[in-house]
Amino acid sequence: MASKALSSFTAKPAVSLLPHGVSSSASPSVMSLSFSRHTGGRGVVAASSTVDTNNMPMTGVVFQPFEEVKKADLAIPITSNASLARQRYADSSEAAINEQINVEYNVSYVYHSMYAYFDRDNVALKGLAKFFKESSDEEREHAEKFMEYQNQRGGRVTLHPIVSPISDFEHAEKGDALYAMELALSLEKLTNEKLLNLHRVASENNDPQLADFVESEFLGEQIEAIKKISDFITQLRMVGKGHGVWHFDQMLLN
């Protein structure tokens, strides 16, 4: 029947890769592949493959894809709930990513509370409100970036609970602006410690791709944020709690 007809051919090396003057009889057979095509099917199937790689000369064919894909760590999952993309991604790396997602969301939540406080009509420091709103958005974007990476590596995103932040940042001695900025610096340093821990997990699991992701996307940016907020704290300490805070706020606003 036409639907069951087969077309077959044998593929053998057509070009010798041996050095000039060396007889091909001195080298073992490299590869012989037979392919069968079902005219009613959807592809080509490799029916057989005979490869002797142990005695293969260095000038011969080195990469044998049909043999190497048989390795256990390259096996493709057949269950629907298993990731097809996952490769060399340790469970501890997956868990550490989920923890970092939680860190970023928690810091974003605190900054959002600061934004709401400084936007009050009886506080009215619009520059600080703007700064902490932007900081909150940035931390949320970091969390989403980690979530995207988790999915790229074939991990499962698990969102952990977020702690409710305080809503008032008044401080009798320091004033609200300096107090909030010092708290922000502590949060940025804490985030940096968490990122370094994530990088350490990647190194322990021999995962250069995760290590590169943390280095290229977060570590440099983190020290820039620490320096920026440190400068703000120094300036706020110089101006004190009075009228100078308003001028500092205008600097952030404009």
Swiss-Prot record:
Entry keyword Acyltransferase: no
Transit peptide extent on chain: 1-47
Extension peptide (EP): region residues: 48-86
GO molecular function terms listed in the Swiss-Prot or TrEMBL record: ferric iron binding; ferroxidase activity
Subunit and partners: Oligomer of 24 subunits. There are two types of subunits: L (light) chain and H (heavy) chain. The major chain can be light or heavy, depending on the species and tissue type. The functional molecule forms a roughly spherical shell with a diameter of 12 nm and contains a central cavity into which the insoluble mineral iron core is deposited.
Entry similarity comment: Belongs to the ferritin family.
Coiled-coil region list: none
Main localization (coarse): plastid
InterPro entries xrefs: Ferritin, Ferritin-like, Ferritin-like_diiron, Ferritin-like_SF, Ferritin_CS, Ferritin_DPS_dom
Record has Nucleotide-binding as a keyword: no
Enzyme category, top tier: oxidoreductase
Annotated GO biological process: intracellular iron ion homeostasis; iron ion transport
Cellular localization per UniProt: Plastid, Chloroplast
Enzymatic reactions: 4 Fe(2+) + O2 + 4 H(+) = 4 Fe(3+) + 2 H2O
Lineage: superkingdom: Eukaryota
Protein name listed in UniProt: Ferritin-1, chloroplastic
EC number of the protein: 1.16.3.1
Provenance organism: Brassica napus
Domain Ferritin-like diiron: 87-240
